């Protein structure tokens, strides 16, 4: 389950691809084949969920993310090498909602809601520009640990790299 170009280690992104791909395969199959792909979707989703925070990282007074009240619960850690959180979700919340119905596991849908609401915290709009953001800009590298990418450190986000995928996700 490793896929990123910027990390040579385990990461959440490949598990999201696996969960999404097997989800679509389960939608177009029936019977035993459907069950096989649904079970693979569930397995990949559980692995992906292991990358998501179930608690809120504390920020010191004066750190931008703490000052704006960012809650890390529901955010996904990128990898063991790239130690920041980001909004790389795409269809994963929909996959979790489907799994919730498919397996009668309400906690899947519950956590899909946690992820969805958490991801909206840094969406900039007039009157809520999230510190250094501009309308339409969504940060990729949200620095919640002492690991520093060379821009402000913990409690800030790196505004140097914000590709279009953050908007698409």
For each feature predicted by the language model, list its residue ranges.
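Glycan-recognition and catalytic cores of secretory/periplasmic carbohydrate-active enzymes
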Residues: 1-169
């Amino acid at each position: 389950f490793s896929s990123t170009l910027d990390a040579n280690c385990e990461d959440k992104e490949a598990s999201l691809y696996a969960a999404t791909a097997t989800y679509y395969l389960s939608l177009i199959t029936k019977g035993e084949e459907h069950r096989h792909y649904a079970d693979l979707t569930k397995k990949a989703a559980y692995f992906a969920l292991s990358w998501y925070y179930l608690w809120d990282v504390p920020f010191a007074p004066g750190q931008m993310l703490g000052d704006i009240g960012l809650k890390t619960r529901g955010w996904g850690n990128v990898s063991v090498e790239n130690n920041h959180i980001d909004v790389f979700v795409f269809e994963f919340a929909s996959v979790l909602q489907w799994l919730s119905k498919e397996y009668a596991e309400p906690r899947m849908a519950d956590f899909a809601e946690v992820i969805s609401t958490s991801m909206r915290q840094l969406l900039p709009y007039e009157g809520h520009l999230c510190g250094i953001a501009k309308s339409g800009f969504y940060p990729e590298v949200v620095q919640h640990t002492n690991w520093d990418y060379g821009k402000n450190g913990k409690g800030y986000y790196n505004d140097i790299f914000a590709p279009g995928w953050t908007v698409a996700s």
